[in-house]
């Protein structure tokens, strides 16, 4: 049966090359959905806390495949080759500006959209930031070309914390979400640490029916998932999903714990987490050792009460005052965060 499916796929590919990726995708998705259904008596496995190996429904399109400007961009484009040539050497932001100034399609704030097909997702890339000026240009050097090859509409939001309070990564993500939604009706949010560099452009930065964990294999963890509930580094949710879970918690001052709380929120809302298959989720991390940032010692007490806090601490109790500036490649959102800006009522 599997051999027949493969043969049928080859025949479909040869006969459908000129009619556009959307039709081709629908045919192949239908064929694979039937295969999945015959195994599980459903279109999807019951447990979605897994890699996408079982759910993978299409191969990457061949080089000579034709798709049209009025069709939705495919998810698996010929331009997505897999391994990326990673260059971790420092580079000045001025040099990054010069490199991408040659592309007139990149608008102020780093907005870009494809011209040869209709983007499947409008993606806001949110980057929490403090004192990482040497890391940001390295990230942009890799992410911009990758997202262009994936034919996503995207923009970058650098959410920078100033002041004397410990770094609050989760609250910065909430601020970034609120500000990004003022610009465009984004439908996919990528929460991206500035020191995480993807190693494969087949790690598609779109969203799906379930929240997505992209950074599953980090070099600093020997390319192993530290634990099943690990949700750190790079994750993605649709706007609907993010609002349903009430965003990130605001109460995590210092590093550690906020990603575990996000995992709990996702599970409490009835979602599961999907992950890329195999080596697609590999990332290199820029060493930094949390320079000057304190570890949040109260994280375990908060995590024990994740469910009780979820409806009280997040997007619905967030207050802030932002200073907005624009770079050629990103929008900078500067905030001075304090605990008083996100007080939690007793639970």
Label each residue range with its predicted role.
Residues 72, 95, 124, 135-138, ...:
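Acidic, Ser/Thr-rich intrinsically disordered and amphipathic helical segments
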Residues 164, 168-170, 177-179, 188-192, ...:
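Conserved catalytic core of nucleotide-sugar-dependent glycosyltransferases
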Residues 1-73, 77-96, 251-254, 260-347:
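C-terminal catalytic/acceptor-binding lobe
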Residues 3, 8, 121-135, 139:
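Hydrophobic transmembrane alpha-helices of multi-pass solute transporters/permeases
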Residues 103-115:
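A short, compositionally biased domain-edge/stem linker segment
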Residues 119, 131-135, 160-166, 194-197:
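A conserved acidic beta->alpha catalytic loop
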Residues 121-127, 143, 155-158, 176:
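Hydrophobic targeting segments
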Residues 114-120, 132, 139-153:
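Short, acidic, metal-binding catalytic loop of nucleotide-sugar glycosyltransferases
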């Amino acid at each position: 049966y599997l051999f027949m499916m493969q043969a049928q796929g080859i025949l479909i590919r040869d006969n459908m090359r000129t009619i556009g990726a959307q039709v081709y995708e629908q045919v192949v998705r239908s064929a694979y959905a039937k295969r999945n259904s015959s195994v599980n008596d459903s279109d999807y496995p019951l447990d979605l806390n897994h890699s996408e190996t079982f759910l993978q429904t299409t191969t990457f399109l061949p080089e000579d495949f034709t798709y049209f400007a009025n069709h939705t961009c495919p998810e698996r484009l010929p331009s997505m080759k897999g391994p990326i040539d990673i260059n971790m050497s420092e580079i000045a932001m001025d040099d990054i500006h010069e490199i991408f100034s040659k592309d007139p399609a990149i608008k102020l704030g780093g907005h870009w959209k494809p011209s040869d097909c209709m983007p499947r997702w409008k993606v806001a890339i949110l980057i929490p930031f403090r004192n990482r000026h040497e890391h940001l240009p390295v990230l942009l050097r890799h992410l911009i070309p990758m997202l262009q090859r994936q034919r996503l509409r995207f923009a970058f939001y650098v959410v920078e914390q100033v002041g004397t309070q410990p770094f609050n990564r989760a609250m910065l993500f909430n601020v970034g979400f609120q500000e990004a939604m003022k610009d465009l009706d984004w439908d996919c949010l990528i929460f991206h640490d500035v020191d995480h560099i993807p190693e494969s452009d087949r790690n598609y930065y779109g969203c799906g029916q379930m929240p997505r964990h992209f950074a599953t294999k980090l070099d600093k963890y020997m390319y192993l998932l530290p634990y099943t509930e690990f949700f750190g580094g790079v994750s993605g949710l649709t706007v609907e999903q993010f609002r349903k879970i009430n965003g990130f918690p605001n109460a995590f001052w210092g590093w550690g714990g906020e990603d575990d709380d996000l995992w709990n929120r996702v599970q409490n809302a009835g979602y599961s987490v999907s992950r890329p298959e195999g080596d697609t989720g590999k990332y290199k991390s820029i060493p930094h050792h949390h320079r000057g940032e304190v570890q949040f010692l109260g994280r375990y007490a908060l995590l024990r009460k994740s469910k009780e806090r979820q409806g009280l601490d997040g997007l619905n109790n967030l207050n802030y005052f932002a200073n907005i500036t624009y770079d050629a490649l990103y929008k900078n959102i500067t905030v001075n965060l304090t605990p008083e800006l996100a007080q939690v009522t007793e639970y």
